[in-house]
């Protein structure tokens, strides 16, 4: 983060934590305290503790305004409307008064972009744009994905997607008649929405009744103009054993499912894998995410 302010020997870095992310504030406080002991000027603040002054962005230290050089954004873009100081932060960044990281890249919120990788009209484009080695890796990582587009088709046309009763779809609502085996699919909302994170808007086809599946498909089609949905082949996460601490501090071996969230830093034209967040969840959870009964661990890459 300090490298984002190359003109400063010891820049002032603020970790700005929103109310929506407040459960992580104690961890950020701990991290900032440790970095301060190492001589770095790093501060963990709530987003409402920063304020504008003379075009720059500041916070209060014992009654004195301290100018901020770098803001680590610990808030989501979908939550901007609920953050009173967000326009001050963005304005200071636009004016070159602060560096902001992670960068504002809303396209990362769109699950629908995953469907573009498997789109039959884009196969030649990916062959020309991505190396064979990279395509093989991406093909193994990205499950087959389709955008739920309810636009009517000509009578002789079919959707390039999953099957229902062994037949191609003419409408996404045809998928309501799919067998339970064919419903090994997951329906997700894409983009900015309160249900688009934390698995709130996720429906696994063979895990709900036929009626619930049909209702979810109807909702996805009805909301296509404002909030796109995607359907993906459902893949279970890996199951493995890992040592955990019990409430009394004893170590025991537990079975669970693992999710890895990689974190990358972009330095100029170079992209570096900095680490990953490993989430170890109970084995009975089909949908895994940051949850109270799961354990998080940070994996650093050197």
Predicted features along the sequence, with ranges:
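Domain-scale recognition of functional cores that engage charged ligands
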Residues: 1-302
């Amino acid at each position: 983060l300090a490298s984002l302010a190359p003109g400063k020997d010891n820049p002032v870095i603020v970790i700005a934590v929103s109310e929506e992310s407040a459960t992580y504030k104690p961890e950020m406080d701990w991290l900032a305290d440790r970095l301060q002991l190492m001589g770095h000027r790093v501060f963990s603040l709530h987003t409402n503790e920063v304020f504008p002054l003379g075009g720059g962005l500041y916070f209060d230290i014992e009654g004195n305004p301290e100018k901020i050089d770098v803001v680590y954004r610990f808030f989501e873009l979908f939550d901007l409307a609920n953050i009173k100081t967000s326009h001050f932060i963005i304005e200071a960044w636009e004016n070159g008064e602060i560096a902001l990281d992670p960068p504002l890249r809303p396209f990362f919120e769109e699950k629908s972009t995953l469907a573009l990788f498997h789109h039959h009209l884009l196969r030649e484009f990916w062959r020309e744009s991505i190396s064979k080695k990279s395509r093989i890796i991406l093909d193994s990582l990205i499950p087959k994905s389709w955008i739920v587009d309810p636009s009517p088709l000509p009578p002789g046309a079919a959707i390039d997607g999953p099957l229902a009763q062994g037949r191609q779809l003419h409408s996404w609502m045809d998928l309501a008649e799919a067998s339970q085996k064919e419903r090994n699919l997951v329906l997700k909302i894409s983009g900015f929405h309160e249900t688009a994170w934390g698995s709130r808007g996720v429906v696994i086809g063979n895990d709900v009744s036929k009626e619930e599946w049909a209702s979810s498909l109807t909702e996805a089609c009805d909301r296509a103009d404002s909030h796109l949905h995607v359907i993906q082949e459902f893949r279970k996460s890996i199951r493995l054993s890992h040592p955990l601490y019990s409430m009394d501090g004893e170590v025991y071996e537990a079975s669970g499912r693992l999710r890895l969230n990689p974190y990358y830093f972009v330095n100029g034209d170079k992209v570096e894998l900095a680490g990953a967040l490993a989430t170890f969840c109970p084995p009975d959870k089909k949908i895994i995410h940051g949850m109270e009964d799961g354990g998080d661990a940070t994996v650093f890459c050197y």
